[in-house]
Amino acid sequence: MSALNKIVKRSSSQPTETDLLVAQCLYDLESSSKDMAKELRPLQITSAREVEVGGGKKAIVVFVPQPLLKAFHKCQARLTRELEKKFADRHVIFIAQRRILPKPGRKSRVTQKRPRSRTLTAVHNAILEDIVFPTEIIGKRTRQATDGRKTIKVFLDNRDANTVDYKLGSFSSVYHKLTGKNVTFEFPVATGEGL
């Protein structure tokens, strides 16, 4: 078994250098760590991309097949920590590979309805959930400026503020790169109303 077996690609496309690097790291972790080997053996990736985060830093976005997402979630905290050790100064983010089906036009003869999970809105919301995974999204607000620009303000759970706080810039840059939408992440300020 080699690192190439960790990559699921269509036969027409060749794996990139980043794909091979991430796959090799997954394979090395599987072979070196006995306690993680059982969890890592069935896991595969579809692709990996480096995204410019700002300030000269980069993040690695690892795309995984949709059916394997739950298996990745089981060991994601430890896997992310190990991969971030190997890729110094880069944040690692796991996102499921999803497909957006176009909205059927007036002249298209479709035989079945487009599933909700394949709409643009559903895919973008799912990407947002994947990016912040260990943390839960508590609320969202869409702010529209007078010049027409929209900014999504996402409120995250306060319990994970210490573990995720330093990654918020990476999260917003990756989401903007993948979807084209501006987003800011915040932790809600606790007020003393219940006292």
Curated annotation (Swiss-Prot):
Q: Which UniProt keywords apply?
A: Cytoplasm, Nucleus, Phosphoprotein, Ribonucleoprotein, Ribosomal protein
The cellular location(s) given in this protein's UniProt record come to: Cytoplasm; Nucleus; Nucleus, Nucleolus
State any GO CC term: small-subunit processome
Main localization of the protein described in the UniProt heading: cytoplasm
- Record PTM Phosphothreonine, positions in chain: T146, T151
Q: List the GO biological process terms.
A: cytoplasmic translation; ribosomal small subunit biogenesis; rRNA processing
InterPro entries reported for this sequence: Ribosomal_eS7 (IPR000554), Ribosomal_eS7_CS (IPR047861)
Record-level Gene Ontology MF annotations? structural constituent of ribosome
Phosphoserine PTM positions? S172, S173
Tell me which family the UniProt entry assigns to this protein: Belongs to the eukaryotic ribosomal protein eS7 family.
Assembly state and interactors? Component of the small ribosomal subunit (SSU). Mature yeast ribosomes consist of a small (40S) and a large (60S) subunit. The 40S small subunit contains 1 molecule of ribosomal RNA (18S rRNA) and at least 33 different proteins. The large 60S subunit contains 3 rRNA molecules (25S, 5.8S and 5S rRNA) and at least 46 different proteins. Interacts with snoRNA U3. uS11 interacts with MPP10. Component of the ribosomal small subunit (SSU) processome composed of at least 40 protein subunits and snoRNA U3.
PANTHER family under this entry?
A: 40S RIBOSOMAL PROTEIN S7, SMALL RIBOSOMAL SUBUNIT PROTEIN ES7
Report the function annotation for this chain: Component of the ribosome, a large ribonucleoprotein complex responsible for the synthesis of proteins in the cell. The small ribosomal subunit (SSU) binds messenger RNAs (mRNAs) and translates the encoded message by selecting cognate aminoacyl-transfer RNA (tRNA) molecules. The large subunit (LSU) contains the ribosomal catalytic site termed the peptidyl transferase center (PTC), which catalyzes the formation of peptide bonds, thereby polymerizing the amino acids delivered by tRNAs into a polypeptide chain.
Protein name (database record): Small ribosomal subunit protein eS7
